[in-house]
Every structure is written in C-alpha cells, then in structure tokens.
C-alpha cells in the first residue's frame, strides 16, 4: 500500500483543549496538501475552518466529547449546530453509563436521533473500546449497525488507551454490512496504519501520520 493511499483514509486530527487557530490552520493546510479524508477539529472552530477551506476539504468534528455522558438532547443540538456551521462529518461519543447498565436500547435510540439530524452527513460512533468488555463491543457492533450510523469508531484518544488490532478484528467480524470502521488513538507509524487498514479499518484518526510522512521525505531529500 502506497503512502498516498494511507493518507486518503486519515482524519487528520487536532482536538487538544488548548488548540489555537494557527495550529488549526496548520492542520487544515496539511490535510489539504496531503489530500486526507478530512480534518477533525473542535466544534468551536468548525465555522471558521469551513470558510477557510472553502469546500476543498471535509470538516469533521466531535459531539458529546470526550466522555459521552451529556444528554441526548444536548448531543442532538451539538450535531445540528455543527452541521449548520459547516461540518461534513460528525464523530459522536456514546454514553458508556448506558452500556454498563446494560441499556443498549437507549444507546441505539440516541444514535438514531443523531443520525436523523445528520441526514446525508457522515456519522461515526465512538464506543471507547478500552472501556469495554469483548461482549459489550460485540453488542455495540449490532447497535451501531441497526442505528443507521456510517461508522463505528474505536476511541476518543482521551481515555486510557486507543485503537488496538484486536478490537478492529472484532469490529470487522461483528459489524453489519454497510458500516465502516474507524481506528483512532495511538496510531503512530505507517506500519500500524497499514495493519489497521488490512484488518478492516477504512478510516484512521491520527495526528501523527502526516508528521511521519514529512520526516520520511526530509530523510530522503538529505541522502
């Protein structure tokens, strides 16, 4: 797999709580230059970013982030607001307290409501795999499939661990037809990126891949 093909799967991400506009601009510029799938940024920057890229790049943002336990009504509003401001893709965090209470019907209904607001915009559902048992992850693969979401996503990158090969393998086995997989959090090498893609991920959430590509290009130029 060529580097350009990996880059096409990347949601180039900056979600740091202290992210400044110049830093966001760099993310947007790099994402456009390297033709990534999108740039994933905080909701407060979506409107400005959408104006800045002027249709040349998909803008992704997050809702219910990073803990997921805001109310469904709050998440629905966040989704609507983000789309009105120019977001093309929404990454939502599920309420893990519902999962731990075994209330998967509530999780599914919340996703359905948010997908209804998204309409044709892409919705990715973050399940925070590091907090789940294997049985919970398998159940959530069914929940996400039935809800009509476009992607199931491993991680926020703000919890105890990010994506693992094992979790993506489980997702690929149990998620329904038409639902894609996004691996996110801790993807720090091109080899890891290739492995996640080979296991079934069609999107990668990472802030590091472009930096790695730039460093490799610098090494090559210095020879």
From Swiss-Prot:
Protein name per UniProt: Deoxyribose-phosphate aldolase
Gene3D superfamilies with a match to the protein in the record: Aldolase class I
Source organism, top-level taxon: Bacteria
Protein family according to the UniProt entry: Belongs to the DeoC/FbaB aldolase family. DeoC type 1 subfamily.
Entries under Pfam families matching the protein: DeoC
Entries under SUPFAM superfamilies matching the protein: Aldolase
Active-site residues annotated for this sequence: 91, 153, 182
Intracellular or extracellular location(s): Cytoplasm
Keyword flag Aminoacyl-tRNA synthetase: no
HAMAP family: DeoC_type1
Enzyme class: lyase
Its EC number(s): 4.1.2.4
GO cellular component: cytoplasm
Signal peptide: none
GO biological process, alphabetically ordered: 2-deoxyribose 1-phosphate catabolic process; carbohydrate catabolic process; deoxyribonucleotide catabolic process
Record keyword Protein biosynthesis present: no
Pathway given in the UniProt record: Carbohydrate degradation; 2-deoxy-D-ribose 1-phosphate degradation; D-glyceraldehyde 3-phosphate and acetaldehyde from 2-deoxy-alpha-D-ribose 1-phosphate: step 2/2
Reaction catalysis annotation: 2-deoxy-D-ribose 5-phosphate = D-glyceraldehyde 3-phosphate + acetaldehyde
Keywords: Cytoplasm, Lyase, Schiff base
Function description: Catalyzes a reversible aldol reaction between acetaldehyde and D-glyceraldehyde 3-phosphate to generate 2-deoxy-D-ribose 5-phosphate.
SMART domains: DeoC
A GO term for molecular function: deoxyribose-phosphate aldolase activity
InterPro entries listed in its UniProt record: Aldolase_TIM, DeoC, DeoC/FbaB/LacD_aldolase, DeoC_typeI
Source organism: Streptococcus pyogenes serotype M1
